[in-house]
Structures are given as structure tokens and as C-alpha cells.
Amino acid sequence: MYKGIAGSEGIGIGNVVIIEEHEIVIENKKITDTDAEIARLQGAIEKFVNDTNAMADRMEKTVGAKDADILRGHIQMLQDPTIEEQITALIVSEKITAEKALDQVLEQTAEIFAQIPDELLQQRATDFRDIKARILKILLGIEDYDISAAPAGTVLVAHDLTPSMTAGIVAENIAGILTEVGGRTSHSAILARAMEIPAVLSIDGICTSVKNGDRVVLNGTSGEAIVNPDAETEQKFAGLLEEYKKEKELLKKFAGVPTVSADGTKVELVCNIGKPEDAKKAVECDGEGIGLFRTEFLFMDRDTTPTEEEQFEAYKSVAETMKGKPVIIRTLDIGGDKEIPYLGLEKEDNPFLGYRAIRFCLQRTDIYNTQLRALVRASAFGRIKIMVPLVTGVDELRSVKAMVADIMKELDAEGIAYNKNLEIGIMMETPAACMMADVLAKEAAFFSIGTNDLTGYTMAVDRGNSKVAYLYSAFNPAVLRAIKRIIECGKKEGIMVGMCGEAAADPKLIPLLLAFGLDEFSVSATSVLKTRKTIADSSMAECKALADRVMACATEAEVQAVLAQQ
């Protein structure tokens, strides 16, 4: 059995087709005609843009505009004028080929993003390498395997499935996907989920462990795959596939109903989004609001910071789309670890612990004040709440509240409407915030637990480092105690406590969160109905009894053993 990351839920049974990567050899030679080389580069870029637009159009017809925009985003990334300028300058100054110059510039850019301790932003490294590989293949005349020709019952196996590869997939022919790299936030996972194809990612060495035609069964929910299973195992997976199909039908009855436990405890079930247009998906999937709107993506892939008006329109559009439902908007979570050229930030040795999020914002008040003004103005159009990331003490919260108070005075003088009862809360994601939760709860309007970073900081682990990734788990007793303390401190002061990390949708963790008293679960739009069903199947009495046993555990293994008995 092979174990990896559960990238896209579901059961798959089929035959292996390996997507082999062509070796790209770049000659290290000098050129004499730089104009001709620049023309080659521009021709390749033009073909790349045309091909990408065509792929995005096809993808839009099959999985929708939201996922097709991942590919269109590649065009925007490449059209950053500084990138082509750097490549052209290298061709002219170093007298090197278009291939060599392109490789150097895009690999340097990719490496910057790869060092960012944020899974969503690390994905940009994969994007830039996909762009680089595709343009290099155009320049070198290399053609890839046509995924659209894969026969029915195919399990695709690849080092990674880039957005451009995924665009060619005919969903009904693909039984599953296995890759050597990638996580739940990688584009291969996002697109697999959009096409409802089960996927297991980050299986080390899978490409060399299987051969074309091998029979594979996989469980994208548990992150497991078995190559050439015996008849009994394949029959078992066939049964699981039928059960999965029935469960999907069953989930439909959880649309349009409140999120309530089996014995009547009501909680809010809201969605995480990264772009204004994602709010429509949240509505379509029956989300009860927005629990996390990541605003940093408004600041990326451009040459200047977004204006107040640009931000105002983005926040307003989400508020209006949600029609009076709560919308929690996280202020800028960006800093020295992000390659945003116009910010002029220095690269840091340890950006995970560095100049980022609220630390950056309180020093760059010119940028932060603009964002806060846009947020306060947009609050007139819906139930917007402001959330401050990476807080470690009450002084940071007080500084933000003081800035907002000053902005409100300005808007009063200008005669501009806003919500005078605008709530300002905290992203609880550091051990410092956890230890100070009793103090912070007295001054914050709400808490939202960011389990991804809280787990990393609490366990002192970089989940991107395979040697220590085993330590990264929300089921570790230390992390569970941190979560429980934050919720208890919030409840004592009567404020709402939510969770917007991946753990909020984990069916094994949900009963514990209910027992702890979590008020709000913020999940991906596609996880709404499944999470609602898990909550509906849970009784508070049973959840509390389970939590008592779990909180008596000393190790993660003990926690998992208790949960396995349920």
C-alpha cells in the first residue's frame, strides 16, 4: 500500500497511464543575433498565451470559470512587464539563448515563492515552473502526451499534474490521479476536486514504482493507493465506490437546512475564499457566510498596491453577493517572505517568524490605512467583520482598533456611510495568542482559529520538510489543548469563536470541536454539505464523552487510537 496526501476525495479503480516528463536540455551557448533571439522568445510567448486561452476556454465549459481562471492567471503572471524585461535584458547582456534566459529568470522567481511558508503562495512556484516548462517546450519543439486521449478507466500517474496538463483531462475517462508532489492546496488538488476525480498526492517515488497498465485502486479520502490488488481487495474497493456514490446522493438532502447537531446545538457553517468571485461558489454550495476572505491575492501579480477604490469594490462585491450573511475579511497577511517587487522587501532567513502580516501592516500604515478605509466603507453594504492575522499580543489589536476609529472619524467628516458597530476580531494562530487568549478575548469581537499555522508554530515544525512533517498534526495533544483553551477563553467572555483551518472540515476532529464549544466552522465550499452531515450525525453528549477520553491522552498515537474506536 502507498500512503500520500488525500488531495481529492472519492474511490478510484483503473489502469495506470504514466505521464512521463520530457528531459529539457538547454544548451549553454552564446548567440550573435540578439534581435532574432528576442523574436523567438516573443513568438513562443505568443503561442503560450494563445494555447493557454484555448485551454482555459475548454476548461470553463467542463468545470466552470473559477477553475479556468487558474490557467488565465498564468497569462497574467507571465505578462508582468518586469519578467519579460529581465529575460530580454539577459539575452542582450549575456548573449545567451532565449531558453537559457527564460530558465534563469523564471526559476529564480519560482524559488522565491518556494521559500514562502504559506501553502497557497508556495503554489506560485509550481505555476512559474509550469509556465517555464511549457515555453521551453515550445522553443525546443517538444510535444507532451495528450491527456485528452486517455482511455476510460485511466489512473494518471505523474510527478505533478500542472494546471496546463489538467486542462486536457476528460473527467469521465479518469478514474483517479496519483502524484509524487503536491498538497491539498495545490492546483492539481483544486482541479481534481472541481472535476470530482479522486486523487492521492505526494506519494514518494510512485512514478518509478508502477508501470503503464498496472491495476490500481485508490482512496482519495484517506490518501491510500494499492497497486495490482488481489481480487478480494479490488472487490472491496468496488463496494466502497458504490457506497461513496450513495453518500453523495445522500448529502443533497443537507442543502438548504440549518447546521444543527443531532441534539439541537446550532453552529454556523461558512466558507473560506481567496478571491471576490469565490463568494458565488460559497452561495452555490450553501455556505452560511464567509469565515475567511484572504485579501493578499488582491495585492499580487501587479506593479502597485491596489487602490482604495479597487479594494472597496472587491470587499463590497463579496458583501453584496452574500446578501446579509456574515463576511469575515482578513487584513493583509504578507511580508518579507513574499516576492512583491513593488514593496521593496528584503529576503529573510526565517520569514515564517519574520516581518509579515500585522507586523508589516503596522509599520507600513500607508498601505494598511488604505485597506482599512476600504473595509470600513464596504461595511455599509453587508455584515463585514475585520480579522487581524498573526496577533501575538493585545497591543497589536489596540493599534488596529485605534486606526479604524480614526478612519471612522474621517468618514464621518466626509459624509461617507459605514457600519458604526463594525466588529474587529483576531486570527488565533500563534502560541502567544493562545497563552494570552483570556486577555485578548476581553478586547476582540471574535476569534477565528487558524489551525494550519497554529499547528506549525505550536509543534515548531515546517510541514514542507519531509523529515519532520510527521510532527505536523492537529491531533497532537498540544495542539488540541491550545484549541480548547482558545475556545474556552472566548466563551468565557461571550465572543464568537470560529475555525478557518483545514481541521474545521475534518470529520474525525469535528466531534471534538463541537464538544469544546466551537461556534463557527469555516471550510472550503465543496466541504459544506459533508461537514453539515457530520455535525448533524453528532450528539453533544457523545462528543463530550469522546473529548474527555481524548484530552486524557498523552500522545497523538493515543488520540488516534481513541478516535479509531468510534
Give the residues covered by each predicted segment:
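Non-catalytic, soluble scaffold/interaction modules
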Residues: 1-321, 327-334, 364, 368-372, ...
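Conserved alpha/beta-domain cores
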Residues: 248-566
